[in-house]
Amino acid sequence: MSDLGRGEGTGFDAERKMQFLYQLRQKGVMDKRVLTAMEHVDRGAFVRGHFASRAYEDVPLPISSGQTISQPSVVGLMTQALNVQPRDTVLEVGTGSGYQAAILSHLARRIYTIDRHRNLTREAEIIFTRMGLVNITVLTRDGSFGLPDQGPFDRILITAAAEDPPGPLLQQLKVGGVMVVPVGQSDTVQSLIKVTRLETGFDYDELMPVRFVPLVEGTARD
């Protein structure tokens, strides 16, 4: 079994949950369905080693392959902006730790999550199986091209920064669908953008400043 930090010794007990949800509300996460989903997903299961003791702090933390697990408030705000509906099919680009996909799995009918790092997708699959999350499909792919064979999607969430919303992914969004994506250079503060596909094109709404690792083409050699 992979040596994954599962949050043992920290405990996502009732008191921690109350504090965790309070800090999410303080940062603007108010959607009840999102809060309930985040209450049901123990972030400690996705944080490795000695960082597990900080799993419930509102900070990003390092994971494998030079990547990070985003701070909970950013995860909550991105999920809230995505406005996922129960019958939706969602594409997540950038599996990372798997935490975001696990939350989405409580909100949507089907989740496809892809990452260029095989070790990350493998570790995420182990955690999803352990949690009994059966509506998530995990694939090792070049995320910048999405999954055209599975689209179009009701919602697309990109958890890495692109210089512009990727064209192939925009084309995989249903009319009426929503994409949330960080846009900007990797070495500067980026903007979180909400894209809605209309009959006649796309509507863009700037939400807030963020910092994410860059969206990189190709698959990693790991």
Curated annotation (Swiss-Prot):
Name the domain of life.
Answer: Bacteria
**HAMAP family recorded for this chain?**
PIMT (MF_00090)
InterPro entries according to UniProt: PCMT, SAM-dependent_MTases_sf
Localization, UniProt: Cytoplasm
According to the UniProt entry, its GO molecular function terms are: protein-L-isoaspartate (D-aspartate) O-methyltransferase activity
Q: Which GO terms describe its cellular component?
A: cytoplasm
Which top EC class is given?
transferase
UniProt xrefs under PANTHER family: PROTEIN-L-ISOASPARTATE O-METHYLTRANSFERASE, PROTEIN-L-ISOASPARTATE(D-ASPARTATE) O-METHYLTRANSFERASE
Catalytic site residues?
A: 70
* NCBIfam families linked to this entry: pimt, PRK00312.1
Q: Does the keyword S-adenosyl-L-methionine apply?
A: yes
- What does the record give as the organism's lineage? Bacteria, Pseudomonadati, Pseudomonadota, Alphaproteobacteria, Rhodobacterales
Underlying gene? pcm
| Keywords of the record | Cytoplasm, Methyltransferase, S-adenosyl-L-methionine, Transferase
Question: What does the protein in this record do?
Answer: Catalyzes the methyl esterification of L-isoaspartyl residues in peptides and proteins that result from spontaneous decomposition of normal L-aspartyl and L-asparaginyl residues. It plays a role in the repair and/or degradation of damaged proteins.
SUPFAM superfamilies the UniProt entry points to: S-adenosyl-L-methionine-dependent methyltransferases (SSF53335)
Q: Which organism is it from?
A: Jannaschia sp. (strain CCS1)
What family does the entry list?
A: Belongs to the methyltransferase superfamily. L-isoaspartyl/D-aspartyl protein methyltransferase family.
GO biological-process terms attached to the record: methylation; protein modification process; protein repair
Q: What is its EC number?
A: 2.1.1.77
Protein's name in the database: Protein-L-isoaspartate O-methyltransferase
Catalytic activity annotation:
[protein]-L-isoaspartate + S-adenosyl-L-methionine = [protein]-L-isoaspartate alpha-methyl ester + S-adenosyl-L-homocysteine
